Amino acid sequence: MSKRDRNPASAALRRKAWTLIVLAACWLPCVGLWAGTADDATRLRALYQNLKPQLDNNAFHRRMYLDSQESFSTVRGEVYAEVDYPFATVSNVLDYQSQGLANWCELLILHPNIKYCRAPGTNSDNMLALNISKREAAAELPATYRLYFRYDAAARAPGYFKVKLHADSGPLNTRDYQIVLEAVQLGSNRTFLHLTYAFSYGLVGRLAMKSFLATFDRGKIGFTNVAGPSAAQAEYVDGIRGLVERNTMRYYLAIDAYLATLSSPPDKQFEQRLSTWFNSSEQYARQLHEIDRQQYLRMKQDEYRRQQTE
């Protein structure tokens, strides 16, 4: 045994050095994680400042901006909105993992094409089973398509969070479905939301989507005006991009309706959410109107009861 090995002070120093190395190895990833989420919060606040002109002046009659992009294999819709809800309220109901799954189902079922939403496993599974229909009308579950979304509380920092819902596959040979919500605190009673809805497809999926749109979606439009600056009247985007814009807006209105009714008595909240969602969607009837109010309310009441019992 060497003198160094017999020296208690030397051994103590080596143990301390190894302890510091281990702590550093554990600490550095955490620093990266918090730095990343802090950067995300800074980025989202900067984006809010850049989008202020669009939030102040738009055709939506609310402080929001909608954008979309389509490539050969992916389509994405995004809504940016300033809402009059405290950040803590938004975070507690949409980013709180033990209740987040159930809360997301409560709001997703407001979308007219969503026919069923349940968390089939335990909270640790972080999975949502979602049934969607081709048409905005009542449908039996065997006639719908089931997607399995994984819920992920992706990032969290003071005054900021991001959650992701992701499904590997969908109908019509589509794949990689994503619903992503991030939020940042603006003040004591205001929050800036960024919602993304996206999916991907290959050549077969793209052809299937075009066939679907030609059959079920003829004449339907989105929100983006694609007419030139000298055009006499607006010309709105259609096709796959128009479809994703409509659905992105429907999901955003569901989030807004859910948040708007949290202060109501629990036994009144669902009915109020239905009314709030339908009234909001009718503000954009040219893009979103499919069925009348009573049809929507009756359909969703039936679907909600089914969701609670099956």
Task: Label the predicted regions.
Residues 36-59, 64-65, 70, 80, ...:
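Terminal "cap-and-tail" regions of soluble proteins that handle hydrophobic small molecules
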Residues 74, 112-174, 178, 200, ...:
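Glycine-rich portal/gate segments that line the openings of hydrophobic small-molecule binding cavities
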Residues 84, 150-160, 182-192:
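A short, structured loop/turn motif at beta-sheet edges
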Residues 19-30:
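Bacterial N-terminal signal peptides
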Residues 1-15:
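N-terminal secretory signal peptides that target proteins for export/translocation
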